């Protein structure tokens, strides 16, 4: 097992958790692209925080628990994790699907949280049933997905250079991502009516070129959370931790220090 990675058993699940760095605790919830794409940014965060970064069950080759079938299962798993670690004044940082997860945690219980940061989060549906608020990344071909995810599509991983093992992990990540987010697609229709319960300072960080959930979506999200602030990151798409990591880091540090 790599340094800094431990296994914590919760709900009968052997949860892999990275715990590295010193400073205020920061719980990092990765997006649907899997934990591996967040590792470089995670390492930068460890220079300033005690980072706690679980791998969502089903990602990175881990099994999906038999009793898991919705994102809500992750919500209660991570509420249990916060209790088990007995951490307080936590900065909760979530990316994309992980941002939705972070918002769901915060509407239930903020007693262990100090601040909430949502990076290009999904989770709400501003429009009606017939409105496509969130791009369908599961149906689109790879080149189209790259254009949705990246300001510069050439930054997208080249599948032709991946090993069979890497492709296997990618496929299992995709299955887990779909299981957590497919029905209803990438949102909880009740979340918008609960966001007023968030009582900690909240920052939304958004790539200016996000093709999955555009800026208009971010503005609606911001307006639903009391006192929330939205900061737009230029030359970044849905994954600013990959395209503009230093800019993203500075915004996280500035907000956490307030």
Give names to the regions the model predicted:
Residues 52-93, 242, 250-253:
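Active-site loop/oxyanion-hole signature of alpha/beta-hydrolase fold enzymes
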Residues 100-108, 113-144:
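Flexible "cap/lid" loop of the alpha/beta hydrolase fold
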Residues 127-133, 139-199:
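Conserved alpha/beta-hydrolase catalytic His-Asp/Glu region
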């Amino acid at each position: 097992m790599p340094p800094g990675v431990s296994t914590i058993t919760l709900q009968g699940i052997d949860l892999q958790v990275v715990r590295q760095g010193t400073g205020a605790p920061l719980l990092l919830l990765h997006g649907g692209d899997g934990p591996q794409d967040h590792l470089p940014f995670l390492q930068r965060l460890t220079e300033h925080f005690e980072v706690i970064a679980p791998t969502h069950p089903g990602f990175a080759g881990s099994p999906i628990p038999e009793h898991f079938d919705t994102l809500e299962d992750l919500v209660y798993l991570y509420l249990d994790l916060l209790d088990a670690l007995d951490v307080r004044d936590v900065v909760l940082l979530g990316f994309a699907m992980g941002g939705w997860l972070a918002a769901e945690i915060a509407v239930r219980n903020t007693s262990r949280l100090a601040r909430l940061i949502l990076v290009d989060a999904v989770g709400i549906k501003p429009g009606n049933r017939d409105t496509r608020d969130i791009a369908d990344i599961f149906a689109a071909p790879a080149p189209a997905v790259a254009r949705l995810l990246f300001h510069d599509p050439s930054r997208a991983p080249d599948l032709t250079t991946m090993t069979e093992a890497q492709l296997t992990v990618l496929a299992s990540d995709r299955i887990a991502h779909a299981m957590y987010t497919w029905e209803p697609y990438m949102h909880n229709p009740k979340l918008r009516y609960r966001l007023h319960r968030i009582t900690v300072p909240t920052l939304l960080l958004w790539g200016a070129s996000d093709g999955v959930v555009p800026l208009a979506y971010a503005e609606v999200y911001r307006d639903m959370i009391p006192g929330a602030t939205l900061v737009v990151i230029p030359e970044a798409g849905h994954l600013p931790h990959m395209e503009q990591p230093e800019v993203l880091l500075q915004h996280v540090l500035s907000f956490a220090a307030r």
